[in-house]
Amino acid sequence: MAQTAMIIGASRGIGLGLVRELAARGWRVIASERSHSAGLHDVARERPGQVEIVTADVTDRVQIDALRAAGTPKSLDVLLVNAGIWDAQPVDEASDADLLRIMRVNAAGPIGTARILLPLVRDGGILAFTTSRMGSIADSSGGSELYRMSKAAQNMLARGVFVQTAKPRGIPVLSLHPGWVRTEMGGDNAPVGVAESAHGLADVLSKAHPLDHHFLDYTGAELPW
């Protein structure tokens, strides 16, 4: 039987690349978009019956609740929450609105979404988040403070989801650094292509992992918290 993954945030970039990669490996993929994504709909047309498109925004509780209500409990092998925005401002130069926005999109939104949708993941499945090694406290070179802060917060909150909810059901939690990828957010100078990152992430998601909260990059290497 084909494995099933739900990818929240699949309109473009890494999320879209992962939809393509998993579908090519025979997975069934439920992929979310906030607004119409031509690229995602192209993949769905190429993979009829294999790629299903849903609407979801991690900052919209009504949409996420509706997605859970429409889903089948314990039907997913993998739930990956892929959401993020970039803001390199120092914290002392950011407005209150900037602070709230990046924390909502990069930390609170993905974690809240995961908590709502976790009942759709089978016992022993995988819950994953796209994070960044820039959220590492042990390996920080400084700068880009808003972004680093938000990803460190996401990592901490993901630990709470693991301890409180996922661990009792045998679900490991993966906080995944996809690499510095050539996307709209990563820019043209990034050294890693979308296909390379997606291939590595798919390998990581396809493997069994010890029951813990893991901080890994797209090659499967452990990263320091």
Go through the PLM ranges and name each one.
Residues 11, 15-20:
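N-terminal Rossmann NAD(P)H-binding glycine-rich loop of SDR-like oxidoreductase domains
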Residues 171, 175-178, 183, 187-225:
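C-terminal helical subdomain
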Residues 85, 90-100, 111, 123-167:
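Catalytic loop of short-chain dehydrogenase/reductase
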Residues 46-62:
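Rossmann-fold cofactor-recognition segment
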Residues 59-74:
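Conserved Rossmann-fold cofactor-binding substructure of NAD(P)-dependent oxidoreductases
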Residues 25-40:
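Conserved glycine-rich Rossmann-like NAD(P)H-binding loop of the short-chain dehydrogenase/reductase
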Residues 7-8, 81-82, 126-132, 172-177:
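Structural signature of the Rossmann-like NAD(P)-dependent dehydrogenase/reductase core
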